[in-house]
Amino acid sequence: MLRSHGAGVLRKSDAGQQVTLAGWVSRRRDHGGVIFIDLRDSSGITQAVFREPDVLAQAHRLRAEFCIAVSGVVEIRPEGNANAEIPTGDIEVNATSLTVLGESAPLPFQLDEPAGEELRLKYRYLDLRRDGPGSAIRLRSKVNATARAVLARHDFVEIETPTITRSTPEGARDFLVPARLRPGTFYALPQSPQLFKQLLMVAGMERYYQIAHCYRDEDFRADRQPEFTQLDMEMSFVDAEDVIAISEEILTELWMLIGYHIPAPIPRISYADAMRRFGSDKPDLRFGLELVECTEFFCDTTFRVFQAPYVGAVVMPGGAAQPRRTLDEWQDWAKQRGHRGLAYVLVTDDGTLGGPVAKNFSDAERSRLASHVGAEPGDCIFFSAGPAKSSRALLGAARGEIANRLGLIDPEAWAFVWVVDPPLFERADEATKVGEMAVGSGAWTAVHHAFTSPKPEFEDSIESDPGSVLADAYDIVCNGHEIGSGSVRINRRDIQERVFAVMGLEKAEAEEKFGFLLEAFTFGAPPHGGIAFGWDRTNALLAGMESIREVIAFPKTGGGVDPLTDAPASITAQQRKESGIDTKPKEVE
């Protein structure tokens, strides 16, 4: 080894020891005939002092981020010079030798100062030397080890599934890879290990997991990555309760890494109640502000805007004090989300109603509205009217915006909830409106994925009333973020074919795209279920990071670009020719 100790482990008890440290120059300070270096490695920082003429002369050439090795004697710092802000602050190393292991060019940014994200990502190897980014990646390693330990206790088998496979419709666009040896054909990078893990259950593996890399060619979004990671699990001979139990055990141990004990059992809410009360299938329960149903209240209204299939409201405490300009900005906020605006009523100090909408109400509506929605004098009532799903979603977003503006969210709080019993199907046109891809060509598509089992009591309604069918599914939500999604799976060919048919995948097309899975179901497929945790988001929450990019070693930007390697990049004409990307596939006779 080139060093005897880590820079962050030395203490008073090590005084008098001869040590060799290796790391990077974090700071250099010249004090008239003495040079002080803060030497940093992955374990921390130790101050090295250069007094002896030989090493002092060498130390003059040191600059920030030079990689060096220092030998010397551990000494207790002179009285008054201790640094209580670092664990090694009571000692220093009196250097007797210095070796420069690697010089550093002038830095593109100072590691102890803020820098723009694109610059940080271009020089990510420098960014990760900083305490915050580096600590987040190291925490991720502990998170992986902790999850593996829990699953090992329960006899799970870690199995790697293919990362190049065939393209199958799973709800997003595939990344395609040309198959050189079969010109005109393509592999696809997997959007998830879903099909393979189900086949592993048919294979008798019974308890499977992997930390899986997944790929989705989605439209660019601020906090999405084209390549992401899941903790993927599947179990045979289980129901939803079994999967939820092991999931809660994993989550409990993960959050213990940061000193928080998750109260057990984690509460549950139905999908329908989550949408009705919070306007979201991933509600943030760190604060109140529930939505109020107003459809019946306005059932006889003459106000045409509220003559809608759904009318709802959310109250902003103290919101009546907002200036007109701010209230106008709320309208722009709603329009950015695809709505015409956000109607509002102000409750004045004497309890009367103000604002442009209130004049359209009847006397009876005005007299009872504040009581109905739970508003007090000085509050603002926001409304949305129209189709229930989109109107509730707008109010749910407004609920979160209100909480942020009023400081209602405790940043140190944790709120977990299982959202259960979602619909199995949704209208395909509604899915495509929000950027999702319909699996088939039918009027309905899967809410989760096409392999989710309906709850048994709804099997007879699959064809006759798809919109009423509930899925045997469960999502785990933390602080308004979905961090895991799971379900009991279909394990019967006839049920799977019926679900495909509702989504517009008739037997011939289903056989072409999923024949291998359907055939496997004919060989005694066991009941099975599982869950996949969004590992990047889970790690970001544990590390206290806003963006998942902070917990990925080499992430892409929101535009899907890697500033470090300048990927994606064009290919040469020779590469294009060899790949066969322009070759038409041979017709199957």
Swiss-Prot record:
It comes from the Bacteria. The keyword Transmembrane helix does not apply. One of its GO terms (cellular component) is cytoplasm. The record marks H31, G80 as: Important for tRNA non-discrimination. L-aspartate binds at E170, R216, H448, R489. One of its GO terms (biological process) is aspartyl-tRNA aminoacylation. PROSITE patterns: AA_TRNA_LIGASE_II. Keywords: Aminoacyl-tRNA synthetase, ATP-binding, Cytoplasm, Ligase, Nucleotide-binding, Protein biosynthesis. Residues 563-589 are annotated as: Disordered. ATP binds at R216, D217, E218, Q225, E482, G534, W535, D536, R537. Its EC number is 6.1.1.23. One of its GO terms (molecular function) is nucleic acid binding. Homodimer. Aspartyl-tRNA synthetase with relaxed tRNA specificity since it is able to aspartylate not only its cognate tRNA(Asp) but also tRNA(Asn). Reaction proceeds in two steps: L-aspartate is first activated by ATP to form Asp-AMP and then transferred to the acceptor end of tRNA(Asp/Asn). Belongs to the class-II aminoacyl-tRNA synthetase family. Type 1 subfamily. This is Aspartate--tRNA(Asp/Asn) ligase. The lineage of its organism: Bacteria, Bacillati, Actinomycetota, Actinomycetes, Mycobacteriales.
